[in-house]
Amino acid sequence: MACGATLKRPMEFEAALLSPGSPKRRRCAPLPGPTPGLRPPDAEPPPLQMQTPPASLQQPAPPGSERRLPTPEQIFQNIKQEYNRYQRWRHLEVVLSQSEACTSETQPSSSALTAPGSPGAFWMKKDQPTFTLRQVGIICERLLKDYEDKVREEYEQILSTKLAEQYESFVKFTHDQIMRRYGTRPTSYVS
């Protein structure tokens, strides 16, 4: 089987390589402005808003004409809208984190271990774990210790029962051996 690798040409060179009279069609250039795929992976996207694109982007270009690039004013407006959206998003993030901090400071520390269904747990977020990692470790240690104690008691009971059975069989075997060896002879102090 043959395997081949191909490289795509960058879009900026296509305009220079293809003349308007060329039989090949020109590839669409990407829209100017912010690209949605270039956000940092840990950042949450700002809330979606309905925006109307600029008038130059709404009208399709006739088939034979070149596509116009946005004017510096349109680029400035796009950047300004994106910056305002980013500021609102950051403001919401700060307000939410402050309200969470205030809520957790006003609650008593004893309610941190309440069950999720109890009335004292209404302030907890859904994503917040009920127990910390240390508390889970302590709970697991206690459960393992209790289970180990239970198994140990059960083992001791079974072992003592088996030992008692073995002792009884030993006594019976010894009694049978003595009776078989000496049979009907009377026992004496000197044997």
From Swiss-Prot:
Gene deletion effect:
Mice grow normally and do not display gross developmental abnormalities. Embryonic fibroblasts obtained from null mutant mice do not express Akirin1.
Report if keyword DNA-binding is assigned: no
Q: Where is the composition biased (Pro residues)?
A: 31-48
Q: What's the domain of life for this entry?
A: Eukaryota
Q: Where in the cell is it found?
A: Nucleus
| Modified-residue entries (Phosphoserine), positions | S22
Query: Per the record, where are the segments of Polar residues compositional bias?
Result: 49-59
User: A single GO CC term, please?
Assistant: nucleoplasm
InterPro entries with a match to the protein in the record: Akirin
Residues of the region (Disordered) are: 17-70
> Position of motif SYVS motif?
188-191
Which positions carry Phosphothreonine? T71
Sequence motif Nuclear localization signal, location on chain: 23-28
GO BP annotations of the record are: myoblast migration involved in skeletal muscle regeneration; negative regulation of satellite cell differentiation; negative regulation of skeletal muscle satellite cell proliferation; positive regulation of lamellipodium assembly; positive regulation of macrophage chemotaxis; positive regulation of myoblast differentiation; positive regulation of transcription by RNA polymerase II
- What more is known? 'Akiraka ni suru' means 'making things clear' in Japanese. The name is given based on the presence of the clear nuclear localization signal.
Family per similarity comment: Belongs to the akirin family.
Described purpose of this protein according to its UniProt entry: Molecular adapter that acts as a bridge between proteins, and which is involved skeletal muscle development. Functions as a signal transducer for MSTN during skeletal muscle regeneration and myogenesis. May regulate chemotaxis of both macrophages and myoblasts by reorganising actin cytoskeleton, leading to more efficient lamellipodia formation via a PI3 kinase dependent pathway. In contrast to AKIRIN2, not involved in nuclear import of proteasomes.
Q: What is this protein called?
A: Akirin-1
What is the species listed in this Swiss-Prot or TrEMBL entry?
Mus musculus (Mouse)
